[in-house]
């Protein structure tokens, strides 16, 4: 196997002095398109070690009592849980336990505003603009790692949901039977198998190609169950959450935990079951996808069970300004109308100050980053009462 393309520091210094910038960008684009996409390298040994580390994480390791903020300061619903602000701090332990299986799949997806890695690598135009990052970011050399950084900042890479947060959620809520109606990249599946309390996981996702990979994950996790661990089972349903028939699971799950798509920010496939394909504006998406899906799965929740939804509002660029588009308040207003629902609060999930996935803007206050505070996405929490 030939070595991957690389430009040493002295070579790049020479290029900067001698050659025209636009010529360099175009030439680099052509050359790199003859190389494979620079996916992160995750070995089987790394997979095993990270999965074992994930099992060892306990929720007190990540759960922090401290103030945090979101990009929206105007939510109607309180951002506390148990009368205090708490959040899961950022930690990369366990990422490889799902990313080993899903990274190429994840890198095949594009965002609304920018192409993903796979689309970029197959377009001379996108590759040429990508090469501009060598200049704007003042890199001194080029290798696979630098290229991944360039893609992550200049283009679009769908981020993972932290498997360690999922594991901690399951253990914190003592979740046994779990429903996830938007499985995504299998990160919450990894967290489930690593959890102490989980027994059964049912996952729903309409993207057909994901399911063969979920099966690989399931087989690996079940093969690597320790002698003293209780066995776990999982089932995957390839369907749209708003359509799927869940009557067999009436009042069955003690926890529903998911992170749905953020309207059309990520376009996972062109399949007719995709919510962004079905609904072309946010109002329809809220009312005909998210709210219908929530009502559908609510019937599967046991009394005293919990629904947890990680979702955030999005921004639309218009006339030079970021216009907020509401998802969270309409969702919570909808859930509040159920006769057997009780809003319990919100737990934060810490993100980088400049999150790339989903094309979501950094949390800001009057356009300025709050650099001395912790930026989080909300995990909204509802409890199902006994209806009396």
Predicted regions and their residues:
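Mobile active-site "lid"/loop adjacent to the S-adenosyl-L-methionine
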Residues: 253-296, 314-322
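Short alpha-helix immediately C-terminal to the canonical SAM-binding loop
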Residues: 209-214
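N-terminal accessory regions of S-adenosyl-L-methionine
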Residues: 1-159, 321-329, 344
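Conserved S-adenosyl-L-methionine
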Residues: 194-200
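Conserved proline-anchored active-site loop of SAM-dependent methyltransferases
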Residues: 166-172, 178-191, 203-205, 239-241, ...
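Class I S-adenosyl-L-methionine
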Residues: 321-388
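Glycine-centered, small-residue-biased loops immediately flanking beta-strands
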Residues: 305
């Amino acid at each position: 196997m030939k070595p991957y393309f690389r430009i040493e520091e002295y070579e790049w210094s020479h290029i900067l002095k001698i050659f025209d910038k636009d010529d360099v960008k175009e030439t680099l684009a052509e050359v790199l398109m003859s190389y494979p996409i620079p996916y992160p390298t995750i070995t089987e040994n790394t997979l095993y070690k990270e999965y074992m580390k994930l099992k060892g994480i306990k929720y007190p390791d990540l759960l922090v009592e401290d103030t945090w903020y979101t990009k929206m300061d105007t939510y109607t619903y309180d951002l506390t849980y148990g009368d205090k602000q708490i959040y899961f701090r950022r930690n990369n332990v366990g990422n490889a336990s799902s990313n080993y299986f899903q990274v190429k799949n994840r890198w095949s997806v594009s965002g609304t505003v920018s192409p993903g890695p796979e689309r970029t690598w197959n377009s001379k135009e996108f590759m040429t603009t990508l090469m501009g990052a060598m200049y704007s970011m003042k890199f001194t050399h080029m290798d696979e790692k630098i290229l991944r950084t360039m893609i992550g900042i200049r283009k679009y890479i769908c981020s993972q949901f932290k498997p360690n947060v999922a594991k901690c959620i399951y253990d914190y809520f003592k979740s046994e039977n779990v429903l996830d109606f938007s499985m995504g990249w299998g990160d919450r599946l990894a967290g489930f198998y690593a959890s102490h309390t989980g027994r059964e996981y049912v996952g729903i996702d309409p993207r057909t190609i994901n399911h063969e990979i979920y099966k690989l994950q399931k087989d690996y996790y079940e093969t690597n169950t320790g002698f003293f661990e209780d066995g776990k089972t999982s089932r995957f349903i390839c369907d749209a959450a708003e359509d799927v028939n869940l009557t067999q699971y009436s009042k069955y799950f003690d926890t529903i935990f998911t992170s749905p798509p953020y309207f059309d920010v990520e376009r996972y496939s062109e399949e007719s079951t995709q919510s962004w394909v079905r609904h072309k504006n946010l109002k329809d998406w809220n009312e005909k996808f998210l709210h219908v899906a929530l009502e559908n799965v609510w019937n599967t929740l046991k009394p005293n069970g919990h629904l947890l939804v990680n979702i955030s509002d999005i921004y639309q660029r218009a006339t030079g300004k970021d216009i907020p588009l509401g998802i969270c308040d309409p969702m919570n207003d909808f859930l509040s109308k159920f006769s057997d629902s009780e809003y319990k609060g919100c737990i934060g999930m810490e993100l980088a100050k400049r999150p790339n996935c989903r094309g979501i803007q950094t949390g800001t206050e009057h356009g300025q980053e709050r650099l001395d505070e912790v930026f989080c996405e909300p995990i909204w929490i509802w409890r199902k009462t006994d209806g009396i």
